[in-house]
Curated annotation (Swiss-Prot):
The gene is rpoC2. GO terms for molecular function: DNA binding; DNA-directed RNA polymerase activity; zinc ion binding. It catalyses: RNA(n) + a ribonucleoside 5'-triphosphate = RNA(n+1) + diphosphate. Residues 1234-1263, 1281-1306 are annotated as: Disordered. This is DNA-directed RNA polymerase subunit beta'. CDD domains: RNAP_beta'_C. Residues 1247-1259 have a biased composition (Basic and acidic residues). InterPro entries: DNA-dir_RpoC2_beta_pp, DNA-dir_RpoC_beta_prime, RNA_pol_Rpb1_3, RNA_pol_Rpb1_3_sf, RNA_pol_Rpb1_4, RNA_pol_Rpb1_5, Rpb1_funnel_sf. Zn(2+) binds at residues 214, 285, 292, 295. Belongs to the RNA polymerase beta' chain family. RpoC2 subfamily.
Length: 1306
């Protein structure tokens, strides 16, 4: 046993047990674990470690650290107030300051514990890995730190207290957002993670170790995994449990040979001596439909080569899916907080000077905190020389680093010299915006700011700051004027309190009689009205509902159609005459006699223009719609009244029958009354159908008409007959009578209102009306007519219907009035910036006013005295007025002559004269010289810095209220690492989705030319090796990460952002297909995509501190990259668009090459895990996953067979699964091939005799019996020995096994 003398924490414990297991097998290590457990419990019991509140000690230096942070922030705030930095830069600086303070405090907490109380229970728990971690301890005894608001934006006030000190109410509320978010998140995460595992299992369930060695010479190049300069996974850790694909040479010495498996010692040795190693990998394994033992390497459960029949696919799926719950799912946008882990900071060790080395070229930049600095374009050295004696220091700076000291500058101790950005790290930026609102009301003034108009495709114009500059807001009280108010003062007027600034007049357009109740909000003006002065209105109720009836003086009754107290439009029907003169008893045919109607519609009726007679030929119509067999009479038959014509239907009058039928369905029966004459010779009668015969005419010999008749010839059952149908006449007058009405009309306005009487017919000339009970032919209506100068105006006018009480006769009369309603605005007092508002009404009830008269006026009065400014009379109405009050001005008296002049804008801190400094920013209004000296009048103001490209919400000279938005600053912010993390990113990768903002990849190798254009866009060209120049369009929000004259390789990133794996595959395939042929190019392309996916998935898990072995991810990625899409089948049987395994199509193509047929052409494809699952060979497995119906119908149509190779299809059918012991069936088929190569392989693994697949080499039987007798029950059996204790030979020997195979074959 080796002796360890160090503190054993959780990680150490893991290592200890793993060491015991590796060297002494499972039985011994389980006993070690058991003993450790006893030891642990014994000491835990003795120690009784628990946390009491006294254990939470806050480091004493905390106060000082917070003070220095606040001091730094105050300096920043002052710079912001002076307009030196923008809102964004202030925010960034505040956030960064608090972030670094929080980090320093965390380190201080650890230091404090270590030095003062190393046996502190909190410290022991957190650092032994028992419970809790640093970030939790920090919240207990450090500071809670910055929190995000519900939108994910960081709040720039951190929680400075910790849980030991306790939170204030505000802090508690702020901190509870994050807490709730965490709970919700965990719930969502579990579900997502479970679904991911399910998909992974489905895609990889049929990956089983089926062979010992596929014999491939291919391999995967493994290097340490880095992010910039930081090593995420060391090379040694990545190699553990892999098998080498090539010998590893150090100089001339071979330190490890091909096909050797790498244990911990060898891994460490290789990791120290070489940078990269070729290893066997599931990705390059050539075993058909499985993975071979050499390519997979160790089974991580046992630390030995994997057994045959091991279901490595399922192990891989669970290894990737299970930690999914630990990944943070929804990532919080941290509002641009960017911790300084990317940039390494160089601080001056002491007082000294800075020199730039040769070849260092820079350009001026403004840092994200608004400081001027230099960005390195070509790398070089930064040399620091101490002022006194001391050693020179040389720092190498990379392109993209920021220098804070110019060449030759003298620097203080701890001054920041540079921020060196790590070599290409996965740092990306995004565009973000921030609103800047004003802190005071006043007048906007642009200083050195040029606004430019941009119009987008939709025609919206935005104003953008072309160059950066300052927006000043000059202080003053701003009054919002209500709509329609006109200012009555001008710029420069001096006003006192109560002076009227503006007034709104309420004007009547038409004039008329005023109706006004005091305290009401409306003033109505009657411009025209009409009264039915002779008629009275009574309320009657018929059939359960009430209605109004108008009784006129001459005895007519009109039914009121419009409800009182409502508005009606022009030409609306107000009332309808109640009369039954035009009521028929049956249906029939209508003919006009001399009547003319205006155009109209069936709904509203046709208005009678010229009177005359309505002629009505009655007939009785029954709509039946029954089977023809129910008909009792025949077509043309003459029946008497009361006859049954169809079963259960009787006619009401005598007449000739007409039957209308269609497809043996009886549609309708018509009974036409009249005199029916048979045995008539048609040649003797000169009348045709529908002719009208006047009274007293002899139609037939002996038949004379007594009244008006209409002729109709009928084919009856007894022959041809003549029917003389009666015709009823209804006279219609030219002008219907209208009731008497008196009206007041405004003649000047040209408005006239009256009720006109109109007659309307509802049926056209010659129309047949089907009815049994009769219809109403004509109705008389009262219609509202409003006449104005123009037709357009009349259409929009409406009249109010009112019932007016007549005092003398004690009844109600109908009155229609046209009102002009004017609303008094009494709600204006609610606007805090509106000034004092008074409204006065200038009319009383019953006044007669002329058009254009002012009815009421509202005055806006000034609240304080001052001078009027900011009225710009132009095209638009004046909406705001500014008053410069005394409190907006500051008077400064000086003895000496000031250095400032009138109209100068000065920021706080500027000198007016030697020794006199401005306390506030402002505009110099006047400089006066008096007897005592000079007097400067300063109008207070606030400058706001605007960065280039910001969107301006205001124009020069606008008036703004406090809190109005001035500009929208557009800035780039670093995406924090956590945005592209967690489950969503894993899912995006494994489903092979295209990322939202993919980066641009170079399609061929060459040299870059990068050009930054005027409009902030970047032009990137690559001059390829054959001289071709290709352009790469760069979108606005993409950042170029290559520099001018940099050499790029095929598939290299030109801009930031995640790569699109599909594009990566395509780029490599297109580049190599002409050089190396389709198969090789497909392999290279797929390998590039595979490497990308494995590394990306690893980096997500690594960033969360989860270790997963590469081989698991490789098994899954192998399934995603196994297929190609056929483009052209050639002479093979494959169809275009079919997905086929790469190896399969290549075998077919090799056969084609031998027979001379045309090979199939194909493109490699990358399938997401869901797609790959649905495209497996086994349709049973695919159908049990998703889209069952589609998969099964397709399989049935195509006549597929399922070879039951995977686990899932066998489980569904209920067979033994081909993994573990069930694998023997498969093993027997390949047994013959294993016999010869067995020894060498097992010895190569250093296992020889104790290989668990070696079934033939068994010790003789008697050894087992003899040994077992001596086994002591207290003896600990080691695995390695236990393997020798195999059971007695199975019932069948090797020969019998052979016979069994023969039987199977039969």
């Amino acid at each position: 046993m080796t002796f360890y003398n160090q503190i054993v924490d959780k990680g150490r414990l893991k290592k200890l047990i793993s060491w015991a297991y590796r060297n002494y097998g499972a039985a011994r290590s389980s006993q070690v674990a058991d003993n450790l457990k006893d030891l642990g419990f014994r000491y835990a019991t003795k120690a009784g470690v628990s946390i009491s509140i006294d254990d939470l000690t806050v480091p004493p230096t905390k106060r000082g650290m917070l003070d220095s942070a606040e001091k730094e922030i105050n300096i920043t705030e002052a710079r912001y107030a002076r307009g030196e930095i923008t809102e964004v830069e202030r925010f960034q600086k505040v956030i960064d300051t608090w972030n670094s303070t929080s980090e320093e405090l965390k380190d201080e907490v650890v230091r404090n514990f270590r030095q003062t109380d190393p046996l502190n229970s909190v410290y022991m728990m957190a650092f032994s890995g028992a419970r809790g971690n640093m970030s939790q301890v920090r919240q207990l005894v450090g500071m809670r730190g910055l929190m995000a608001d519900p939108q994910g934006q960081i709040i720039d006030q951190p929680i400075k207290t910790n849980f030991r000190e306790g939170l204030t109410v505000t802090e508690y509320v702020i901190s509870s957002y994050g807490a709730r978010k965490g709970l919700v998140d965990t719930a969502l995460r579990t579900a997502d993670s479970g679904y991911l595992t399910r998909r992974l299992v489905d895609v990889s369930q049929d990956v089983i170790v089926r062979e010992i060695d596929c014999g491939t010479r291919r391999g995967l190049k493994v290097t340490a995994m880095k992010d910039g300069d930081r090593v995420k996974i060391a090379l040694g850790d990545r190699l553990l449990g892999r098998v080498l694909a090539e010998d590893v040479m150090v100089g001339d010495e071979v330190i490890a040979s091909r096909n050797q498996s790498i244990d911990a010692a060898l891994a460490a040795k290789i990791g120290k001596s070489v940078e990269s190693v070729m290893v066997r990998s599931p990705l390059t394994c050539e075993a058909a439909r499985s993975v071979c033992r050499c390519c997979y390497g160790w089974s991580l459960a046992t630390g030995r080569p994997v057994d045959l029949g091991e279901a490595v696919g399922i192990i891989a799926a669970q290894s990737i899916g299970e930690p999914g719950t630990q990944l943070t799912m929804r990532t919080f946008h941290t509002g641009g907080v960017f911790t300084g882990e990317v940039a390494e900071q160089i601080k001056a060790p002491d007082h000294g000077t800075v020199k730039w080395g040769k070849g260092l070229s820079t350009r001026k930049v403004r840092t994200r905190h608004g400081e001027d600095a230099f960005q390195v374009e070509l790398a070089g050295d930064l040399i620091w020389t101490p002022t006194g004696s001391g050693k020179k220091m040389t720092y190498s700076v990379t392109p993209g680093s920021v220098l804070f000291a110019a060449d030759g500058d003298t620097v203080e101790k701890d001054k920041m010299l540079a921020e060196v950005t790590a070599a290409k790290s996965t740092r990306s930026t995004e565009r973000a915006t921030k609103d800047v609102s004003t802190d005071l009301a006043g007048e906007v003034f642009f200083a050195n700011l040029i606004a430019e108009e941009k119009t987008d495709r939709q025609g919206n114009t935005t104003h953008i700051a072309q160059r950066g500059g300052l927006v000043w807001v000059l202080s003053g009280e701003v009054y919002n004027l209500p709509p329609g108010a006109e200012p009555v003062v001008s710029n420069g007027d001096e006003v006192a309190e109560g002076t009227v600034l503006a007034e709104t007049k309420l004007i009547s357009v038409n004039g008329g009689v005023v109706r006004y109740q005091p305290q009401s909000r409306e003033i109505d003006i009657i411009t025209a009205s009409v009264l039915l002065d002779q008629a009275e209105v009574r309320k009657e109720s018929t059939g359960g509902h009430e209605q109004y009836v108008i009784y006129t003086a001459d005895g007519q009754r009109f039914l009121l159609k419009a409800t009182p107290e409502t508005k009606v439009q022009n030409h609306a029907i107000i009332a309808e005459l109640i009369d039954d003169r035009y009521q028929t008893t049956t249906g029939g045919m209508l003919r006009y006699g001399g009547i003319e109607v205006a155009k109209g519609s069936r709904k509203t009726g046709y208005e009678v223009v010229q009177g005359g007679t309505l002629l009505w030929v009655p007939e009785e119509t029954h709509e039946v719609n029954k089977d023809i067999s129910l008909l009792v009479v025949e077509d043309g038959q003459y029946v008497e009244a009361g006859t049954e014509v169809v079963k259960d239907i009787f006619c009401q009058c005598s007449g000739a029958i007409e039957v209308v039928q269609k497809n043996d369905i009886l549609r309708e029966i018509i009974i036409k009354p009249g005199e029916f004459h048979l045995d008539v010779d048609p040649d003797e009668v000169s009348y045709k159908n529908e002719d009208l015969i006047p009274p007293g005419t002899e139609v037939l010999p002996g038949v004379v008409t007594t009244d008006l008749r209409q002729v109709e010839w009928i084919e009856s059952t007894e022959g041809l007959g003549l029917l003389l149908r009666p015709v009823e006449e209804y006279p219609v007058s030219n002008e219907p009578a209208a009731p008497s009405q008196g009206s007041i009309n405004e003649e000047e306005v040209g408005r006239h209102i009256e009720l006109r009487s109109v007659q309307r017919l509802f049926y056209k000339d010659g129309e047949r009306v089907k009815s049994v009970d009769g219809i109403h032919l004509l109705s008389t209506q009262l219609v509202l007519e409003i006449e104005t100068g123009s037709e357009q105006a009349a259409a929009n006018l409406a009249a109010d219907i009112e019932l007016k009480n007549d005092e003398e006769e004690d009844c109600q009369r109908l009155q229609l009035v046209i009102l002009e309603s004017l609303i008094l605005r009494r709600d204006l007092d609610t606007d805090p910036h509106g000034g004092t508002i008074t409204t006065s009404v200038l009319v009383t009830d019953g006044d007669q006013i002329a058009p254009g008269a002012v009815v009421a006026k509202t005055e806006i009065q000034c609240r304080e005295e001052g001078e009027v400014r900011g009225i710009r009379r132009g095209l638009e109405a004046v909406r705001r007025v500014l008053i410069v009050r005394d409190e907006d001005l500051e008077i400064i008296t000086l003895k000496e002559k000031p250095t400032v002049a009138k109209d100068d804008l000065i920021v706080a801190g500027t000198e007016f004269a030697p020794g006199v400094v401005a306390a506030e920013s402002g505009l110099v209004v006047a400089v006066n010289q008096g007897e005592e000296g000079y007097e400067i009048k300063l109008r207070l103001a606030r400058p706001y810095r605007v960065s280039p490209g910001a969107i301006l919400h205001i124009a020069d000279g606008d008036l703004v209220q406090r809190g109005d938005n001035l500009v929208l600053l557009v800035y780039e912010r670093a995406k924090t690492g956590d945005i592209i993390q967690g489950l969503p990113r894993i899912e995006e990768l494994l489903e092979a989705r295209k990322p939202k903002e993919a980066c641009v990849l170079s399609r061929k190798p060459g040299v870059c030319q990068v050009e930054y254009l005027e409009d902030e866009s970047v032009d990137v060209k690559v001059i390829e090796d054959d001289g071709t120049v290709s352009e790469y369009p760069i979108l606005l929000n993409q950042n170029v990460i290559v520099s001018d004259n940099q050499r790029v390789d095929v598939g290299e990133h030109l801009t930031d952002g995640p790569a699109n794996p599909h594009e990566l595959l395509e780029v490599f395939f297109d580049y190599y297909v002409d050089k190396k042929g389709v198969y090789e190019a497909a392999l290279i392309g797929l390998q590039a995509a595979q490497k990308f996916l494995v590394d990306q998935v690893q980096s997500v898990y690594q960033s969360q501190g989860i270790d997963i072995s590469d081989k698991h991810i490789e098994v899954i990625v192998r399934q995603m990259t196994a297929k190609v899409r056929v483009d052209d089948g050639g002479d093979t049987t494959m169809l275009p668009g079919e997905l086929v395994e790469l190896r399969q199509i290549e075998q077919v193509n090799e056969a084609m090459a031998i027979t001379g047929g045309a090979p199939a052409r194909y493109t490699p494809v990358l399938l997401g895990i869901t797609k790959a699952s649905l495209n497996t060979d086994s349709f049973i497995s695919a159908a049990s996953f998703q889209e069952t119906t589609r998969v099964l119908t397709e399989a049935a149509i195509e006549g597929k067979s399922d070879w039951l190779r995977g686990l899932k299809e066998n489980v569904i059918i209920g067979r033994l699964i081909p993994a573990g012991t069930g694998f023997n069936a498969h093993e027997e088929m390949v047994m013959g091939t294993l016999d010869n190569g067995e020894d060498s392989l097992n010895n190569r693994y250093g296992q020889g005799e104790r290989d668990n697949n070696n079934s033939d080499k068994k010790p003789p039987n008697r050894l087992i019996g003899a040994t077992l007798d001596e086994v002591d029950e207290n003896m600990i059996l080691d695995d390695n020995i236990a393997r020798a204790y195999t059971e007695a030979d199975p019932p069948w020997s090797v020969e019998s096994k052979q016979e069994k195979d023969d039987d199977d074959d039969k």
